[in-house]
Amino acid sequence: MSVENVDNLNEPIEDINNVDIEELPDKKIGTKEVQEANEILRKYKEGKKNLESRVISCEEWWKSNHWSQFKSQSNNINDPKPTSSWLFNSVINKHADMMDNFPEPNVLPREKSDEAVAEALSEILPVVLENNDFEHTYNSVGWDKLKTGTGIYGVFFNTRLQKGLGDIDIKQLDMLNIFWEPGITDIQASRNLFIVELVDIDLLKTRYEELADKISNTGIDISKYEYDDTVDTSNKTMVVDWYYKVNSGIGDVLHYVKYVGDVVLYASENEEEYTEKGYYDHGKYPVVFDVMFEEKGTPAGFGYIDIMKDPQEYIDKLDQAILKNALVLAKPRYFIHDNCGINEEEFANIDNDFVHVASSLEDTHVQQIVGVPIPAQYLEVKQLKVDELKETSGNRDFSQGTTTAGVTAASAIAALQEAGSKTSRDMNKGSYRAYKTIL
């Protein structure tokens, strides 16, 4: 569970407000177990370091901070640093395809006796999704999927919703805030799962008054994006949601612990109600990964930015060379002999009708620096890189409603658009599979 606000904590309030968990005589989860969990969390975090670096880099590419991400930097601070938006344009078109095909639940009976249940679910599920503002969540997860290769849903039961009655809570989870066992491909195969979030210390102390004197800054750090704003986290601490599976002999039982540092805030194994059956009856981690392009050995994938950033880099570098050349040609410069006697200030000011000289002028005293235009073949190289980016991302012109010269028939244009949208259809099917798992 993402703990971005303490009002969203999903453990039963009455179970923890009046009982100090540390004093329970038969508790299975205490300080020792949480300290061991912290060590596992650190190992998981270390194993995910390269992935997190790539995710942060993709976010910078998305924000058009291209030049800070280039493999080789320009050393001349006066060089222009253009950032064309071919990569950005491709991503937003893919996202538009996702939102144009936003799914709706359609529950069908497996057999005749299921018809009544299927009909009831067909009426209930849309209401649950509407209460969760699921379209907004789908939108946000879609951006993550396209940019970084992985969008993550969290599907929880939040006891504080519906005025304390509780309800399903579907959230977007940040890749930097979730940790799993390195080397696994299916997230459900991980031995443990950690979801972390920074929360204000004073809010936690108010929420858990009986543990207020034990709550402090944990010292656990997580990777952060390069924010434009200054983000102060000095008065926040890391709240960890730890999920783990126990083999009961007939299947996996899922348990859940919420803790800060080595202080247990809630543990399902310490509750008689959940000891045998686990925190969720289905026994699965309450997360769903929507992956763009799969990789071996990880439940995460890579996205369109990873594919497009190389051609985008060379497009921008070629743009830099073209613009630099254009600036040199557009503003003539001159070689001037030290002793030619020309008033340089008057010469540089184009508003002066007259320029004073101290002696007679000769051709060798002042010479214009002649620039050489970039040959046409290098301009063509840039266009080839643009075409490469379009082709590799499946964002050809006709997918945006434009066509190349010679294609004018409506049926031909429609056929090109249909053929060109197959990568988007494949992408949407992946999102539909994640949607089905959520439901």
Where are these regions (language model features)?
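Short, solvent-exposed secondary-structure capping/transition elements
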Residues: 137, 162-166, 327, 397-402
